A protein has these predicted regions:
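A short, N-terminal "cap"/entry segment at the start of jelly-roll beta-barrel domains
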Residues: 1-35
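Conserved short histidine dyad/triad with adjacent acidic residue
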Residues: 37-53
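Histidine-centered metal-chelating micro-motifs
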Residues: 48-49, 68, 84, 88-93
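Glycine- and acidic-residue-biased ligand/ion/polar-headgroup-sensing regions
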Residues: 56-67
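A cytosolic small-molecule/anion-sensing beta-strand core signal
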Residues: 63-64, 79-80, 98
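Short acidic-glycine-tyrosine-enriched beta hairpin
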Residues: 74-88
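Ligand-binding loop in jelly-roll beta-barrel domains
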Residues: 88-112
């Protein structure tokens, strides 16, 4: 299975194929419905999540690794166990300082990821 179906109750990570989101970043769309979406992003050290904004509210959980995040005008280093809130429309991005995984929850779902 490459990507799960909308409203799929059970999604097993091992069954999902990742796709290259950018250099050094592999994205896996996990469970989702119209109202929200869970996405795993695997970052290599030095990979960049370019500054961007979108009309979705986003919560990021740092599952592993270390990242320097920019949200609006603030820049902070976060590591495993930390979480971040990015309101819709705010500019944000990151640089991976130590190889790691970010888990993002978006509301509503990101149709552009399907």
């Amino acid at each position: 299975m490459k990507k799960p179906q909308k409203d799929q109750m059970w999604v097993f990570n091992k069954d999902i194929e990742g796709e290259q989101a950018s250099e050094g970043v592999v994205r896996k769309v996990l469970a989702y419905c119209d109202g929200m979406m869970c996405v795993e992003n695997q970052f290599e050290k030095g990979a960049v999540g370019n500054l961007h904004s979108h009309p979705h509210t986003q919560i990021t959980y740092v599952a592993s690794g270390k990242f320097e995040f920019t949200i609006g005008d603030e820049k902070k280093v976060v590591e495993a166990g930390d979480s971040l809130l990015k309101q819709n429309g705010i500019t944000h991005g990151c640089v991976c300082l130590e190889k790691g995984i970010l888990v993002d929850i978006f509301t509503p779902m990101r149709e552009d990821f399907l």
